């Protein structure tokens, strides 16, 4: 008669892990509880998450960065991903939080690596210049060729092709970053 499970060779180590302090190295900040697309498959229900639309305040974001620093132990490099919904809908707070993060790095012996995850609809020169200066990475979302992307990712209120809006911007991101440090 065979056994369904084998012996757990890691069981003797469990107590060692229970005694270790928790160390946080990264946060994904849900900076915008809102979105400017109406993706057919969106888990967020177009930014609402079955609730109201909202934007994170600077004060809440600041507390999140303080929490990350306070709970990062001896880790020097910390990561923060600005996510949503669509984070560029709350771009002023993104800028303020990056500025705050930079202001506390030296005193806390930390280095923040910021990432912006965006659908690209609101990308403009101001956002791109800031991202190229302050964001280690930019994550750009698209759903393939034009026909599929526009079917699955329509703009809110059907304001044209999302593909036609984002593709020139995505190309500009790639060129401005020398084809590096961005993900599609």
Give the location of each predicted region.
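A short, flexible beta-alpha/helix-coil linker loop
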Residues: 11-12, 45-50, 147
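Short, histidine-centered active-site or binding-site loop motifs used for metal coordination
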Residues: 45-48, 82-84, 153
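Short, charge-rich binding segments
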Residues: 18-21, 32, 129-130
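N-terminal charged/capping segments associated with class I S-adenosyl-L-methionine
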Residues: 3, 9, 47, 59, ...
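N-terminal [4Fe-4S]-dependent radical SAM core
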Residues: 1-28, 73
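Canonical Radical SAM [4Fe-4S] cluster-binding loop centered on the CxxxCxxC motif
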Residues: 28-59
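Short acidic donor-binding/metal-coordinating loop in glycosyltransferase active sites
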Residues: 31, 84-85
């Amino acid at each position: 008669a065979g056994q369904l499970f084998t012996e757990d060779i890691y069981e003797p180590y469990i107590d060692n892990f229970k005694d270790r302090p928790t160390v946080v190295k990264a946060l994904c900040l849900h900076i915008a509880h809102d979105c400017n697309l109406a993706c057919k498959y969106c888990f967020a229900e177009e930014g609402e998450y079955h609730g109201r639309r909202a934007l994170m305040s600077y004060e809440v974001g600041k507390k999140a960065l303080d929490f990350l620093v306070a709970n990062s132990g001896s880790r020097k490099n910390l990561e923060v991903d600005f996510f949503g919904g669509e984070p560029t809908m709350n771009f002023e707070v993104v800028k303020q939080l990056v500025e705050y993060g930079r202001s506390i790095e030296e005193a806390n012996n930390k280095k923040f690596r910021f990432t912006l995850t965006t659908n690209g609809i609101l990308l403009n020169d101001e956002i791109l210049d800031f991202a190229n200066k302050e964001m280690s990475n930019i994550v750009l979302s698209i759903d393939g060729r034009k026909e599929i992307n526009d079917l699955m990712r329509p703009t809110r209120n059907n304001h044209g092709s999302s593909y036609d809006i984002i593709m020139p911007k995505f190309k500009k991101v790639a060129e401005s970053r020398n084809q590096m440090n961005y993900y599609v």
